[in-house]
Amino acid sequence: MAIKKFKPTSPGRRQMTVSTFAEITATEPYKPLVEPLKKTGGRNNQGRLTVRHRGGGHKRLYRVIDFKRDKDGIPGRVATIEYDPNRSANIALINYADGEKRYILAPENLQVGDQVISGPEADIKVGNALPLSQIPVGTMVHNVELKPGKGGQMARSAGAGAQLMAKEGGYALLRLPSGEVRKVQESCRATVGQVGNLDWENINIGKAGRKRWLGIRPTVRGVVMNPVDHPHGGGEGRAPVGRKHPVTPWGKPAMGAKTRKKRKLSDKLIVKPRNK
């Protein structure tokens, strides 16, 4: 993925960067694998706001992605590499030998015409999915399952990849993108390679309106609100927070306070916590 810069013809364009989409080979998705996607505006089924800063944005269609990669022993060929508005990674349409078509996350260096296959007997090749027990130590993987057969849940965003560090006692040790080292059952599946679209992290949004196209609304600081709206609000002029530690709009500790549940069952599987 290459990045395009603009001449500073306006304040919004001055720092803006966009992808050239050079690797995209199709402009329209494969209709049978597309579903309607209803916008929530951050509201739940009671109409109450549960996630702030959501709303608006361009209309999207959901592409059904095969995270399970459970079509064993049947080779498939990459038909297209496509843009997906619902994630940072690109997706690849796979034509399988039995006639079925599925979308998968497009790994780095996967090209149209390449062959991919799933199953314990698959080769160690970019785009192939197999159990961690069959993958050599040191390999970069993505779309990693947490429970066998549930489908990939870890290392799915653009540029993400987990490194297989070791195998012992029925578990594989993975170093995740966050720096966390974690045990995962050897029977869990992963896809070989790193997720593509590596330059995603270097994209500069450039202007507020582009955030609105993505369905992200403005974030207002609590310190500029009124006391009725936020614990940091109120005061004459530019007043400080006025507390020992910053808090959320609901009075819970914010900015650095740990939010992970204590004595969580998965704690015993985490060998080294994520980087601060």
Swiss-Prot record:
HAMAP family: Ribosomal_uL2_B (MF_01320_B). Part of the 50S ribosomal subunit. Forms a bridge to the 30S subunit in the 70S ribosome. NCBIfam families: rplB_bact. Belongs to the universal ribosomal protein uL2 family. One of the primary rRNA binding proteins. Required for association of the 30S and 50S subunits to form the 70S ribosome, for tRNA binding and peptide bond formation. It has been suggested to have peptidyltransferase activity; this is somewhat controversial. Makes several contacts with the 16S rRNA in the 70S ribosome. Residues 225-276 are annotated as: Disordered. SUPFAM superfamilies: Nucleic acid-binding proteins, Translation proteins SH3-like domain. This is Large ribosomal subunit protein uL2. Residues 258-276 have a biased composition (Basic residues). The keyword Ribosomal protein applies. One of its GO terms (molecular function) is transferase activity. Keywords: Ribonucleoprotein, Ribosomal protein, RNA-binding, rRNA-binding. GO terms for biological process: cytoplasmic translation. PANTHER family: LARGE RIBOSOMAL SUBUNIT PROTEIN UL2M (PTHR13691:SF5), RIBOSOMAL PROTEIN L2 (PTHR13691). GO terms for cellular component: large ribosomal subunit.
